[in-house]
Regions:
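Iron-associated oxidoreductase/ferritin-like identity signal
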Residues: 1-326
Length: 326
């Protein structure tokens, strides 16, 4: 390594990783919460095909994916520099209204720009030009996010003047215990997103290393590169799962949590990734089948069908990981 890298420098870069994971989770959960807010706004917007909530929901989802890609890019750079990327996230702020989403987003982006200016300056001082260039690119994208949130920071939320609606009998099935069970799925999905993203970047670095067989030389590929590509595909699917589950929780008047459980496990090489990920999928499938059984018992058809669809995809993930371990 031509540049001398200190642990303090790696820690500084990991602050960016924690921040990017935080806002990615924050924006995807806010996007999921939009469906509930849209329903509240329908009486005031009955003649409109589109509301402010639709517009904000769209860019929140786009930002969530982009922020996770930022996290992945910084993770890859940390691994290349010989460090270990963190699995820890700063605490997301979700809020309960469009204006709160915008103000929390504005604050998060302002904090990001301050941190990234420091990283750009530090990288320049030690001659780490690649990291400086990476953060200059990310800085420009975060600045665009800031400007977008500024557009909505002073928007007026829908009034709460409508009369209180009594809870219908069928909605009384949604208890705190049921919300807690569904939130275990949220935690599992967040854990998988972080785990697979970190492994994708670590596998990408391993793929750059020497080829050991004639086939690898001819194909200019190796197992880590194949695993890296697969993990990228799967983590995007897990983002969709997180969105669907958290949206369902919000629609039945619950609150989604934002901490991963279990703690993401990374591993040292491609085989370790696959074993850890197969076990993560196994754990998720067992949990989701428990949720399906409980939803069936309660008569919660929408939740049951949502998780039945998710389980089909999780089983596909399980077998993809298993195929490479045989």
């Amino acid at each position: 390594m031509a540049v001398e890298i200190s642990q303090d420098y790696i820690n500084l870069l990991n602050q960016a990783v924690s921040r990017e994971i935080q806002v990615s989770i924050q924006y995807i959960l806010q996007h999921a919460k939009m469906e509930k807010l849209i329903r509240k706004s329908i009486p005031e917007n009955i003649l409109l095909d589109k509301t402010t909530y639709d517009a904000v929901g769209k860019f929140l989802r786009e930002f969530a994916i982009q922020e996770m890609k930022h996290a992945a890019a910084v993770m890859e750079r940390i691994y290349y520099l010989g460090g270990e990327a963190t699995t820890m996230s700063d605490k997301p702020n979700i809020g309960d209204s469009l204006s709160a989403f915008a103000k929390d987003g504005l604050k998060a982006e302002e904090e990001a720009l301050t941190l990234y200016r420091k990283i750009i300056e530090t990288a320049g001082k030690i001659g780490d030009w690649e990291t400086r260039e990476l953060f200059e690119k990310i800085y420009g994208e975060e600045e665009k996010h800031l400007f977008k949130f500024q557009e909505y920071a002073n928007v007026e939320d829908e009034t709460e003047g409508s009369p209180t609606v009594l809870v219908s009998e069928w909605r009384k099935i949604f208890t705190d215990d049921y919300y807690a069970l569904l939130n275990k799925a949220v935690q599992a999905e967040i854990s998988a997103i972080i785990q697979y993203t970190l492994q994708h970047e670590k596998a990408s670095l391993l793929a750059l290393r020497g080829k050991s067989t004639a086939l690898e030389v001819i194909t200019e590929s190796n197992k880590p590169s194949v695993v890296s590509k697969m993990l990228k595909e799967i983590f995007l699917v897990e983002m969709e799962h997180l969105e669907k589950v958290s949206e369902r929780i919000y629609l039945i008047d619950g609150e989604a949590v934002f901490n991963p459980d279990p703690i993401p496990q990374i591993g040292a090489d491609a085989d370790a990734f696959l074993k850890l990920d197969r076990e993560a999928e196994n754990t998720a499938i067992v949990l989701y089948k428990k949720i399906i059984a409980e939803a069936l018992r309660l008569g919660d058809t929408k939740t049951r069908r949502t998780f039945e669809d998710i389980v089909i995809q999780e089983e596909e993930h399980y077998w993809r990981f298993d195929d490479y371990l045989r």
